[in-house]
Design a protein with these regions (language model features):
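Hydrophobic alpha-helical segments
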Residues: 1-157
Length: 157
């Protein structure tokens, strides 16, 4: 079992949590919605294979108003007509910031996303994506466990 990075250096973890709160505050102030931010977090966590963050942010996305169907179809968002132009833009940012290095295609996606979102919300989306990628890596390296939950979202064990 890995060492929990957050427990080994709680002062660094506290700084990371403050950073995350600052990113969230800045994103909301610049026009990104909670729903959009959570879509970024879930999609990046899917791409990174971070079970702990997927569990957390899928719940938070539902609390923010994202439907279960939107979450279920997220891996195939490009193939559905369900997602709004803004949702598609933030999902493109999530993917470009997570799957590195940037390619010609991801650069084109970022350019299109910036056009849709405007500079402030676009930069906010990039910060949200960068932050969740940090937390994905912390959770993956720490092997943070996912606890079973019932239909009501409460832990069952």
């Amino acid at each position: 079992m890995s060492l929990f990075m957050d427990k080994a250096q709680p002062e660094v973890w506290a700084d990371a949590e403050r950073f995350s709160a600052s990113v969230r505050e800045g994103a909301l102030a610049r026009g990104l919605t909670d729903e959009e931010a959570e879509l970024i977090k879930v999609r990046a966590s899917q791409l990174n294979g971070c079970a702990f963050c997927l569990d957390l942010h899928a719940r938070q996305a539902r609390q923010a108003g994202v439907t279960q169907q939107w979450l279920d179809l997220l891996p195939a968002w490009r193939e559905t007509g369900f997602y709004s132009e803004r949702e598609r833009a933030v999902l493109a940012v999530a993917e470009a910031a997570t799957v590195l290095p940037l390619t010609e295609e991801s650069r084109a996606d970022l350019f299109a996303a910036r056009t849709v979102l405007g500079d402030e919300a676009f930069a906010a989306a990039e910060w949200v994506a960068a932050a969740i990628n940090l937390f994905n890596r912390i959770s993956i390296l720490s092997e943070h466990p996912v606890r079973p939950r019932g239909a009501d979202g409460r832990r069952t064990s």
